[in-house]
Amino acid sequence: MQGTVYKSTGSWYQVKAEDGKFYECRIKGKFRIQGIKSTNPVAVGDEVSFDLEEGVEEKTGVIKKIKERENYIIRKSVNLSKQTHIIASNIDQVFLLITLNNPPTLTTFIDRFLVTAEAYDITAVLLFNKVDTYSIEELAEVKYLAELYRSAGYECIGISAKNGKNVDKVKDKMIGNTSMISGHSGTGKSTLINAIEPALDLKTSEISRQHSQGQHTTTFAEMFDLSFNARIIDTPGIKGFGVVDMDREEIGDYFPEFFERKQDCKFHNCLHIEEPKCAIKDSLEEGEIAWSRYKSYLQIMEGEEDNYRVDQYQK
């Protein structure tokens, strides 16, 4: 039988078969995909072949094969930094929810996420949530960040998942697509999904006052069919985002504003760090490229882990 993985709980996978029915499936033994060393060999969004288990009253299956993925979002695993975790696969676009506070989303985190989306050719849209709660100063900061990322080529939308502001814009972008929603815990992922499709009635989190972080309400990634010809993947809140398996020479290509200028560098293999006559560094000095983006680039190049607790908005 053929189907698509809608939910993964680590050991069991909920698969929607071509007949529209859901089956609880598992994998037997060491199930590894060539070229990918991840903590989860099967991910939400995977298209799989599975066999129903004989002699079992409840309809359970065993996954035999995974169809080649069109793309996936991957990051370093939480517990084992050398291992990776595939968040979801076969995605048309990803929405990254960003909040200025409660919890803060830093540019280092945003940039690492965007680099991964670029590397796997997934369209990313930045959603600045909770705009209804911000002061004039905070709204100015949102405007600054939105302009920064728009100048790098990304679509940015200010929303309020709670009062519905611009939720229709997000919904329109989802029609006909499989979309993934990501961000820190407490940025409003489940609230946004409920605003888009109230019938789902997902559990939402309260913010921990002590740490300004959201409490995890989504433990495992899960995909939902929506009533307007769309699918959405809800993902667990993530703290840091480790970039996986990229050569130093290619990292700059995943910053769109670097890529479009690199042909003007003196050296074709310019890494935009110490080389003379570098178009990226010239653009940086001229204010055409944001310092925060360049700092993120240097951190990724140096292999530094994302420190989401340190304020790095400033130069």
UniProtKB/Swiss-Prot annotation:
Its main location: cytoplasm. Transmembrane segments: none annotated. Its EC number is 3.6.1.-. Zn(2+) binds at residues 265, 270, 272, 278. It is found in: Cytoplasm. HAMAP family: GTPase_RsgA (MF_01820). Monomer. Associates with 30S ribosomal subunit, binds 16S rRNA. This is Small ribosomal subunit biogenesis GTPase RsgA.
